[in-house]
């Protein structure tokens, strides 16, 4: 009898990541369908505004997952080696994207232009997220050190609130339109640090991982509906017909924090014993980076092909369900294939580096006669949790369940 070994991943976190993955494609539907150019009138505008805000949480959710899983990462070589698979994924998808542009879109640029787009991680159409992630990943050990130096829950709660206030609250307030003759917006709260909004979501993820707040699923769903309705209505009543004429909530708005938080809390603590389902969820969530980046090709293909079929709000929902399901299936299939092709390369590059780190750490810190057990999260030389996905496992879950099939 063959035995299946359950993945170390937290199933609930895999669900959050899968939701974020599929939200990427769903959000881009609104970008390419002409939604932002439509006149915001009627119930359809509010309904689709709620859908947009639901899917807009994809990037905040990814960052919160990073905070949740990397909360104990420390400054050491092993931490930075874990970034290599992400870089390889971006470069690989960049090459695929270049081939698509050359052979399918008939684009022609000098080789140096193509190369520059690769080494700046801009070639995959959505490579901006890789630029964000690299920067965040580089400073994670120092963020963790600062956060973990706070001794009490009260201090850490205050840190979360103040960070959100400094990096996001100002944007939300200053953006409120007044449409006055001399004053167009309120604009009285300093927003110089608004670019730090990713750190706000990262710290929220750390906080959830440490204190594991609980809220019933039906309350999460109800509060989520209320917040989505609030954002959609707020935009609707402040707009002058055009979407961008109103309050257009984005990632850096603090109003988005409770929405992302509610989605996270709805899924993150779900547990199941069905090992095949857990394995499937782990495999899907592991390809999130490739899935995100590859989706640009599908977006370009589908929305170019179906552009003439969009007829405003009258068929927006129908077009959503016509494009998004098949887009998800094809993008996921391509991601799993590319993932499998890149996995040996990632292991070939990272495995020797991890061994070198382990030897260096062992030489610098000889084991005591009666060693104290050290958790996986406290050991910079332990690369046992590193596969293709640098965030595929929790730091504390090392249990392996088996079932006969």
Short names for language-model regions:
Residues 1-371, 375-380, 388-391, 400-405:
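Alpha-helical transmembrane segments and their immediate juxtamembrane cytosolic regions
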Residues 397:
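Active-site anion-handling motifs in enzyme catalytic cores
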């Amino acid at each position: 009898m063959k035995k299946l070994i359950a993945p170390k991943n937290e199933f609930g976190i895999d669900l959050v990541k899968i939701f974020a993955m599929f939200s990427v494609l769903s959000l881009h539907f609104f970008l390419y369908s002409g939604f932002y150019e439509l006149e915001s009138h009627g119930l359809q505008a509010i309904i689709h505004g709620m859908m947009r805000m639901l899917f807009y949480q994809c990037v905040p959710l990814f960052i919160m997952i990073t905070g949740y899983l990397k909360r104990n990462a420390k400054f050491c070589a092993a931490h930075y080696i874990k970034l290599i698979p992400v870089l390889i994924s971006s470069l690989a998808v960049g090459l695929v994207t270049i081939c698509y542009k050359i052979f399918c879109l008939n684009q022609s640029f000098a080789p140096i232009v193509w190369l520059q787009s690769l080494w700046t991680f801009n070639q995959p159409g959505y490579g901006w997220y890789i630029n964000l992630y690299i920067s965040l990943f580089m400073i994670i050990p120092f963020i963790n050190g600062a956060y973990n130096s706070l001794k009490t829950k009260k201090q850490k709660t205050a840190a979360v609130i103040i960070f959100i206030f400094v990096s996001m609250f100002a944007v939300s307030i200053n953006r409120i339109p007044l449409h006055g003759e001399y004053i167009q917006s309120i604009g009285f709260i300093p927003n110089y640090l608004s670019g730090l909004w990713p750190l706000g979501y990262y710290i929220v993820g750390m906080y959830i991982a440490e204190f594991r707040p609980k809220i019933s699923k039906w309350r999460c769903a109800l509060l989520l509906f209320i917040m989505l309705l609030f954002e959609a209505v707020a935009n609707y009543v402040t707009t002058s017909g055009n979407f961008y004429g109103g309050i257009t909530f984005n990632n850096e708005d603090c109003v988005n924090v409770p929405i992302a938080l509610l989605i996270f809390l709805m899924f993150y603590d779900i547990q199941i014993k069905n090992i095949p389902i857990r394995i499937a969820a782990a495999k899907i969530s592991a390809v999130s980076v490739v899935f995100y980046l590859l989706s640009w090709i599908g977006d370009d293909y589908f929305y170019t092909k179906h552009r003439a079929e969009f007829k405003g709000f009258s068929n927006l929902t129908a077009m959503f369900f016509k494009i998004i399901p098949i887009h998800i299936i094809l993008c996921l299939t391509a991601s799993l294939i590319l993932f499998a092709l890149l996995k040996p390369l990632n292991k070939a590059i990272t495995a020797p580096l991890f061994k070198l780190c382990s030897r260096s750490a062992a030489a610098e810190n000889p084991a005591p006669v009666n060693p104290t057990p050290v958790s996986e999260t406290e050991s910079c030389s332990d690369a046992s949790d590193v596969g293709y996905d640098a965030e595929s496992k929790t730091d504390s879950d090392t249990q392996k369940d088996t079932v006969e099939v």
